[in-house]
């Protein structure tokens, strides 16, 4: 039987027949059709720490002495209204943006630090 004939036979099978075929192949060859699942261990934790994060939370740690400039910058980067931006700055430390890309996070951090705020990327 050629590969094309096998593929054609599989195309003509019902879902139930395909399920039975998979189970028969698992039994015959001693394999599993389940997707491999990584088990986290001590080595995996160390390897995970070496991987670079792709999403960051931008946290306003402290507004500094130039609070008005910081409020303006917060409004600019978040799109919030004056009242909301002021409340956010007054309530520091507060998260400005969640799951930001590294470049977005760095840009927001630079803009706020430029006006005297202390910002952290977590």
Swiss-Prot record:
Keywords: Ribonucleoprotein, Ribosomal protein. CDD domains: Ribosomal_L7_L12. InterPro entries: Ribosomal_bL12, Ribosomal_bL12_C, Ribosomal_bL12_C/ClpS-like, Ribosomal_bL12_oligo, Ribosomal_bL12_oligo_N_sf. GO terms for cellular component: cytosolic large ribosomal subunit. GO terms for molecular function: mRNA binding; structural constituent of ribosome. One of its GO terms (biological process) is translation. Forms part of the ribosomal stalk which helps the ribosome interact with GTP-bound translation factors. Is thus essential for accurate translation. Belongs to the bacterial ribosomal protein bL12 family. NCBIfam families: L12. Homodimer. Part of the ribosomal stalk of the 50S ribosomal subunit. Forms a multimeric L10(L12)X complex, where L10 forms an elongated spine to which 2 to 4 L12 dimers bind in a sequential fashion. Binds GTP-bound translation factors. This is Large ribosomal subunit protein bL12. It comes from Clostridium botulinum (strain Loch Maree / Type A3). The lineage of its organism: Bacteria, Bacillati, Bacillota, Clostridia, Eubacteriales.
